[in-house]
Amino acid sequence: MEELQGYLEKDRSRPFLYPLLFXEYSYALAHDRGLKGSLFYEPTEVFGYDSKSSLALLKRFVIRIYQQNYFLSVVNDSNKNRFVSHHHNNFXYSHXYSQMISEGCAILVEIPFSLRLXSYFEKKEIPKSHNLRSIHSIFPLSEGXLLHLXHVSDILIPHPIHMGILVQILQCWIQDVPLLHFLRFFLHKYHNWNSFLITPKKSIYVFSKENKRLFWFLYNSYVSECEFLLVFPRKQSSYLRLTSFGLFLERRHFHVKMEHLQMQHLILIVVCRDYFQGTLWSFKDPFMHYVRCQGKAVLASKGTHLLMKKWKYNFVNLWQYYFHFWYQSYRIHINQLSNYSFYFLGYLSSLLKNSLTVRNQMLENSFLMDTVTNKFETIVPVIFLIGSLSKAQFCTVSGHPISKPIWADLSDSEIIERFGRMCRNLSHYHSGSSKKQGLYRIKYILRLSCARTLARKHKSTVRTFLRRLGSGLLEEFFTEEEQVLSLILPKTIPFTFYGSHKERIWYLDIIRINDLVNHS
């Protein structure tokens, strides 16, 4: 393993990935924890990777390619009618083998970036702090920055219309031409295998669900290119070469240093310098803040509305020039921060102005002074969460609780545990809300849905069921989060959960978005 790593460090430009796929000793990589993990050190269960898919399974598939020529038979049968029982087994084989290839390719293409990531942390001496990975850590930082900004822009990063665009982005990082051709061939055949089940508009969506590891690698490389289009004008227009932007680009761009950008980026820089030579003066705004999660980004500025429109115009043009497909300008919304609430990471964030009148007295003269202070507020998006609950069949669209029929076959303790876990996760994730009334409503819907599910199981009404077992049956797991909060806060601070509607608590152990929030 050490010899292989030294070989990779010695010469990264050599085409090692594609031969590595068929090398006998390479399958030991599947058992190496240093290269098996994802680029962001997330555990396997976080992204929902299938533990059954590994290079060991890929090895078996490669052996079958040579022995029984399965791959050619599957490709030849891809255009035939799969509803015939004779070809049903071949279609099942193609689906399983496509996942094996996807998992194996994802592990292989992550190797150079994983090594580069580890060497970057060692060179920069950056500690691997888990607190910095928390989603909640974004809000305290944003609170101090957004108080002094004027405009905010919501940016929706679209999915590429063709999977070939994702492979094309890798050309500037991976010089292994056979691997890129193999990846294109695999994506093309994968589309043919599933063409009778899915439409072209949903092909990327289905691919992202069935091949999570490979898709997220390709999608992250695509998003990093999108962020490069945002960072570059900011770097060129800033008065000083801020180190934070260099660190940002290195972190999000798989740690490719700015002075060592690939040839494709150098071409873009030359074009952009000629394009922005007469207009870069209008982008000189030292107060630009950018944050992104998945496909949504927020860009805030202290500049005027005209400045934000110029950013939008140039970003759209760079996007269309670089990715060669149309970008709808309506995906970027520009609003004044004081009159707008933007949805991000499961919260509705806004900037409120509080007016305060202060009486000042100087000697015998007194006068009144009006002051205006800004306050960053985050609230629970009740409408969005109710929509997620209705999709999951916990309530109606209007928020009326209903029973969960598919859980009625479970035991009473299992039903209560599942509903209780959902309530605790929501309370944990939305603990930073300024107003808890919306969270109480969501918990009430889940509580009554749990009671209706139990009553449905016992073929009784909710009132009769609660009267027989007592209303305290559902109290324990709904108040567990409040008991934890009372232990966390200092004893000297009086704290009552139901009375502290504006108490905000940010946790530093949340590394993924809540499932209900993610589907809202």
From Swiss-Prot:
Source lineage: Eukaryota, Viridiplantae, Streptophyta, Embryophyta, Tracheophyta
- Which terms does the UniProt entry file under GO BP? mRNA processing; RNA splicing; tRNA processing
Q: Which Pfam families match?
A: Intron_maturas2, MatK_N
Recorded name of the encoding gene: matK
Give a yes or no for keyword Flavoprotein in this entry. Answer: no
Family statement: Belongs to the intron maturase 2 family. MatK subfamily.
Q: What are the UniProt keywords, alphabetically? A: Chloroplast, mRNA processing, Plastid, RNA-binding, tRNA processing
Organism whose genome encodes this protein: Iris cristata (Dwarf crested iris)
Family annotation (PANTHER family): MATURASE K (PTHR34811:SF1)
Q: Where in the cell is it found?
A: Plastid, Chloroplast
The terms describing its cellular component in GO are: chloroplast
The protein's superkingdom reads Eukaryota
What is the purpose of this protein? Usually encoded in the trnK tRNA gene intron. Probably assists in splicing its own and other chloroplast group II introns.
* An example molecular function term from Gene Ontology annotations: RNA binding
In the UniProt record, does the keyword Chloroplast occur?
yes
Note the InterPro entries from the entry. Domain_X (IPR024937), Maturase_MatK (IPR002866), Maturase_MatK_N (IPR024942)
Name listed for the protein in its UniProt record = Maturase K
